[in-house]
From Swiss-Prot:
The gene is lptE. It is found in: Cell outer membrane. Gene3D superfamilies: Lipoprotein like domain. The lineage of its organism: Bacteria, Pseudomonadati, Pseudomonadota, Gammaproteobacteria, Enterobacterales. GO terms for biological process: Gram-negative-bacterium-type cell outer membrane assembly; lipopolysaccharide transport. It comes from Yersinia pestis. One of its GO terms (cellular component) is cell outer membrane. Residues 168-207 are annotated as: Disordered. InterPro entries: LPS_assembly_LptE. This is LPS-assembly lipoprotein LptE.
Length: 207
C-alpha cells in the first residue's frame, strides 16, 4: 500500500513539473530555427569545442556534420584566449591571489541574412600557495574547464538575442532576407554588433 502511494506521488510530481514548464538547470529554450546548426571551429576536438558541442546537445540542438550544407545556420567559433593576472600579493611580494580570464569570440551566420557576433568573458579567481605547486596547477585546470563550460552556456543563451535580432531585421525589411534588401538598395550587408542585438558582450564573473 505504501509503495503504491509513493508511486502515485512521484507520478503527480512528474505531471506538475511537466505542466509548469520545468526545465533542467542550465538549459535554454533555443528558437526553432536555431535548433539545427553547423558548428565550425579551428580546433573541433579541443576542450572548448567539446564543451560547446555538449551544451548545444543538452539544449536539444542538432549539430549537423555536413559542412556543405548552406541552408542551415552556422555557429562559428572565431577564437578564444586565456589570461592570468595577479589580484593580490603577500607581504613579501609573492602573488597571493590570481584571476583567470577566458575570452571567447564567435558568430552566427544565418543563410541569406546577416552575421551576428557573439562575445563571452568569464572570470575566476584562485589563491596561489607557493608551497603547493602541484595542487595549484590541478586547481587551475579544474577552474579552466569550469570556465569553458560556463562560456559554452553563455554562447547558447546568446542564441536568443540572435533570434530577436533576426526577427527584427526580417520585419524591418518586409520579410525579405537582409542580403536581398541590402542588394536592392545598392549596399552591402553589415554585421550586427552587440549593441544592435540589444545585449552587450556577456561578461560572467564567479569567484
Amino acid at each position: 500500500m505504501r509503495h503504491r502511494i509513493l508511486t502515485l506521488l512521484l507520478g503527480l510530481a512528474v505531471l506538475v513539473t511537466a505542466g509548469c514548464g520545468f526545465n533542467l538547470r542550465g538549459t535554454t529554450q533555443v528558437p526553432t530555427e536555431l535548433q539545427k546548426l553547423l558548428l565550425e571551429s579551428s580546433d573541433p576536438y579541443g576542450p572548448l569545442a567539446r564543451s560547446i558541442r555538449q551544451q548545444l546537445r543538452l539544449n536539444n540542438v542538432t549539430i549537423v556534420d555536413d559542412a556543405m550544407r548552406k541552408d542551415i545556420p552556422t555557429l562559428r567559433i572565431i577564437g578564444s584566449s586565456e589570461s592570468q593576472e595577479t589580484v593580490s600579493i603577500f607581504r613579501n611580494g609573492v602573488a597571493a591571489e590570481n584571476q583567470l580570464v577566458l575570452h571567447v569570440q564567435a558568430q552566427v551566420l544565418i543563410p541569406g541574412h546577416d552575421i551576428y557576433p557573439l562575445q563571452v568573458n568569464v572570470f575566476r579567481t584562485f589563491f596561489d600557495n607557493p608551497l603547493t605547486a602541484l595542487a595549484k596547477e590541478a586547481e587551475a585546470e579544474v577552474l579552466r574547464q569550469e570556465m569553458r563550460e560556463q562560456a559554452a552556456q553563455q554562447l547558447v543563451r546568446q542564441l536568443l538575442t540572435v533570434h530577436a535580432a533576426e526577427v527584427k531585421n526580417t520585419q524591418k525589411n518586409g520579410d525579405k532576407p537582409v542580403s536581398d534588401a541590402n542588394a536592392a538598395q545598392g549596399s552591402t550587408p553589415t554585421a550586427v554588433n552587440e549593441t544592435t542585438l540589444g545585449e552587450p558582450a556577456v561578461s560572467t564573473s564567479a569567484k
